[in-house]
């Protein structure tokens, strides 16, 4: 029952913050929670991250087919701003890849990332791609802390 209350709170926050993605996600999950079908939940858990990444990648590739001059504009990407954007894109992609494994590592990691991402999305106007990046950054921070203090966080 507590999971339904949390979902209702999130749905309320999504409407207040006008975050359609969080609103739709909470409505879908609330609906599914009433049926408690383990097969459906397991399927979503196993496949939805990859499906979401695929849709995000499709969205990122739209300019290639939408803009006929895209290939000509590639040379313009090698100015200072373009190089900084290229490096940030590469770094974030690597951090996100570290985050995938880190999210699966433990429940305290997953809970903290989820709560932080929900606050970021619902109250601070963020977008819901944060969990992978946040967990990748968290992975690197924990790795550095472990190196410095010889600790096992």
Swiss-Prot record:
Cellular compartment(s): Cell membrane
GO cellular component, one term: plasma membrane
Keyword Methyltransferase tagged: no
Listed InterPro entries: UPF0756_TM (IPR007382)
Membrane topology: Multi-pass membrane protein
PANTHER family for this protein: UPF0756 MEMBRANE PROTEIN YEAL (PTHR38452:SF1)
Family label: Belongs to the UPF0756 family.
Name the record gives this protein: UPF0756 membrane protein NT01CX_1209
Organism: Clostridium novyi (strain NT)
Lineage of origin: Bacteria, Bacillati, Bacillota, Clostridia, Eubacteriales
């Amino acid at each position: 029952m507590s999971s339904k209350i949390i979902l209702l709170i999130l749905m309320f926050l999504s409407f207040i913050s006008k975050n359609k993605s969080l609103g739709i996600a909470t409505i879908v999950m609330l609906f599914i929670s009433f049926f408690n079908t383990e097969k459906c939940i397991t399927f979503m858990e196993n496949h939805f991250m990859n499906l979401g990444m695929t849709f995000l990648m499709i969205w990122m590739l739209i300019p290639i087919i939408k803009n006929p001059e895209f290939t000509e504009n590639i040379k313009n990407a090698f100015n200072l701003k373009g190089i900084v954007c290229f490096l940030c894109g590469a770094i974030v992609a690597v951090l996100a890849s570290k985050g995938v494994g880190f999210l699966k590592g433990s429940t305290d990691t997953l809970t903290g990332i989820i709560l932080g991402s929900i606050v970021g999305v619902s109250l601070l106007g963020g977008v819901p791609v944060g969990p992978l990046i946040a967990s990748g950054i968290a992975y690197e921070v924990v790795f550095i802390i472990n190196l410095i203090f010889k600790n096992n966080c």
